[in-house]
A protein has these predicted regions:
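Residues at the N-termini of beta-strands
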Residues: 98-99, 191, 280-281
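Zn2+-dependent cytidine deaminase-like catalytic core
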Residues: 32-133, 217, 262
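Short, basic/aromatic recognition patches
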Residues: 3-23, 144
């Protein structure tokens, strides 16, 4: 079990290399081990591209060793055709004798089907290795699948005496180091949301300027569409969702999502954003 945990931790390290690029898919890493030596490894690099198991197997130089090897992967191999072929089939085709898994995939298209397919074809399967750590690693994915909503992150800065800004005014209170950290976090999440007053006071850009990576989608709550249209969030530089009670539709990169005033606000916002395939939001 100790060796299983060692190799699973390597899967975690690899999986994290895909953060910010694989949503709505989970972060997955895989290693191929032969006689207690890693002979291949890979991770899911980008949504729509090959999965971790495919990349790990492809990296093995001597394919003859695969039939005597164990593959470690932090999520149950898929068993369905999506944007890529099923990974469980690839493991079977290469006659890999054992597959060690961290978490079962709760996506209804898999949901134990990958494990069953492997076992039915003579592959030994061990699951549940570092299960809790794996759940935390892919907490966004598991929240999406189980609760049908984005994973929500609350971010705020405050002064030592407990204030977040002068009354009615905006402005930075965090330092340059924290600016870099905040922008790094933005690259890893699907969207960032602010309210009416934040747009008025701060005129934020809600993009990534102090770090290298993708811009998140912007989400703005503008109840009756009264925000000035010269604000940065409406500059069409990135996809922006405008939550409101007036209209639906799209104007260039600005997407209007109409809410129902009779329904609970938070619940319908999360449902609407989930429908837009937003899996995590700050």
């Amino acid at each position: 079990m100790q060796d299983h945990e060692k190799y699973m931790r390597r899967c975690f390290d690899l999986a994290l290399m895909g953060r910010g690029n694989v949503s709505p898919n989970p972060k997955v890493g895989a290693v191929v081990v032969h006689q207690d030596k890693i002979i291949g490894e890979g991770y899911h690099k980008k949504y729509g591209q090959s999965h971790a198991e495919v990349n790990a197997i492809a990296s093995v130089e001597n394919k003859n060793l695969l039939k005597e090897s164990t593959i470690y992967v932090n999520l149950e191999p898929c068993c369905h055709w999506g944007k890529t072929p099923p990974c469980a089939n690839l493991i079977i085709e290469n006659k890999i004798k054992r597959c060690v898994i961290c978490n079962k995939d709760i996506n209804p298209k898999v949901f134990g089907g990958g494990i069953k397919l492997l076992q039915d074809n003579g592959v030994e399967v061990i699951s549940g290795v570092l299960e809790e750590e794996g759940l935390y690693l892919n907490r966004r994915f598991f929240t999406n699948q189980s609760q049908k909503r984005p994973y929500v992150i609350l971010k705020f800065a405050q002064t030592l005496d407990g204030f977040i800004s002068p009354e009615g005014k905006g402005g930075w209170i965090s330092n340059d180091t924290m600016k870099v950290w905040v922008h790094k976090q933005r690259t890893e999440e699907d969207a960032i949301m602010v309210g009416y007053n934040t747009v008025l006071a701060d005129n934020p850009q809600l993009n990534v300027r102090h770090y290298s990576g993708r811009n998140p989608k912007r989400v703005v709550y503008d109840k009756y569409l009264t925000l000035p249209k010269d604000k940065n969030v409406f500059d069409n530089s990135q996809e922006t969702y405008i939550l409101n009670y007036v209209k639906e539709g799209r104007e260039e990169n600005n997407i209007f999502i109409k809410l129902n005033e009779e329904l609970p606000f938070a619940k319908q916002v999360l449902e609407k954003l989930y429908e837009q395939k937003i899996c995590s939001i700050v």
